[in-house]
Amino acid sequence: MKLVMVANTAWSVFNFRHSLIKELLRCGVELYVIAPEDKFSAKLTEMGCQVLDLPMQAKGVNPIADLGLMLRLLRHYREIKPDFIIHYTIKPNIYGSLAAKLAGIPSLAITTGLGYTFVNQNVVSQVAQQLYKFAFRYPQEVWFLNEDDRSVFLEHHLIEPDKAVLLHGEGVNLNHFVPSDKPQLDENVRFLLIARMLRDKGVCEFVEAARQIRQHYPNAIFQLLGDCSVLNPSVIGREEIAQWEKEGVVEYLGTTDDVRPIIAQADCLVLPSYYREGIPRTLMEGAAMAKPIITTDNVGCRDVVLDGQTGYLCEVKNAKSLALCCEQFLTLSDSEKQAMGKAGRSFIEAKFDEKWVIKQYFATLKKYEVLSVKNELFM
């Protein structure tokens, strides 16, 4: 069987679908990944994938560039002749679905979060919605990572109800992200935010909450981990972060290929995002490692937290509300914090174990008669 995955970064394919890829390759699937080249392209090749570069303008609507993207995908599909295609993220979902239809190949579209499409009600947003409505007539199914996104598409009549499938996130590897004892570094309590350094991720609210909390709790440490060099109009530059460090309100930890040691030293994972998330992977990873979560009562984010049991939900774009949640956490006893983290791990095990996500992929491929091999992991 030949299978193609298309996304806007090789990084996302490697990091978010690593276990799925391993299982597909183990079952003898000939797997192609089509995405803009980055340092993770080579890692995918090492795994056994055939990787093809796909120049793409990830943001904005440029009819000529987007037509070129669709034609490049159509050429790849006709050359590869795959049995099935899986598209991720906005432009591959739209233009890849159209190219797959023209090539006569069945496909699956997976919406990994709606980003700005339904947040900014402008001309670009309206065009994107109409493109979705046209393109999503053609995939066999469209998967949504949370019920809010699925409901929006149905309410706007952008998709037929029988094609809209709820996935509940892309899952987390529970054997890779496991609870571990926190290193006894000192008596400080560490709040950790892991994300690209974008304003939409609530980074500024995190910093303002840190200012408020540290006036009364000097043992509260606020840490930032993530890339500040991404091409995005919402990005926070290194200079601004350096000013926050100089002020003494946050520590910037840079980037890493393995977040587990940094999660292990934290007491609480925080993501005050107002971006239209799918299901934030960093929150799933933190909860899987038995860390309590503080996040916004926002699309995707709220799905990962049982408010008051596994963490706390704060108001969107409200640093004071976030600070109150942080203070509430600080007043818990050690045993209460541990119980909250343990409850979070149990919640992730019940709802976000990636093995059930992989099972759904295999069931779908068998449903459309493009995969006959048994997946022994679930037999």
Which residues are covered by each model-predicted region?
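Short hydrophobic beta-strand element within catalytic cores of glycosyltransferases
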Residues: 292-295, 305
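Acidic donor-binding loop of glycosyltransferase active sites
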Residues: 264-278, 291
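Conserved donor-binding/catalytic core segment of Leloir-type glycosyltransferases
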Residues: 183-201, 207-210, 223
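Short His-centered aromatic/hydrophobic patch
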Residues: 87-93, 111
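Conserved acidic donor-binding segment of nucleotide-sugar-dependent glycosyltransferases
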Residues: 306-308, 312-319, 328-334
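Donor nucleotide-sugar binding/catalytic pocket of nucleotide-sugar-dependent glycosyltransferases
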Residues: 52, 133-179
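Nucleotide-activated donor-binding/catalytic signature segment of Leloir-type glycosyltransferases, i.e.
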Residues: 226, 235-255
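A short, well-ordered alpha-helix in the C-terminal region of glycosyltransferases
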Residues: 321, 328, 335-351, 357-363
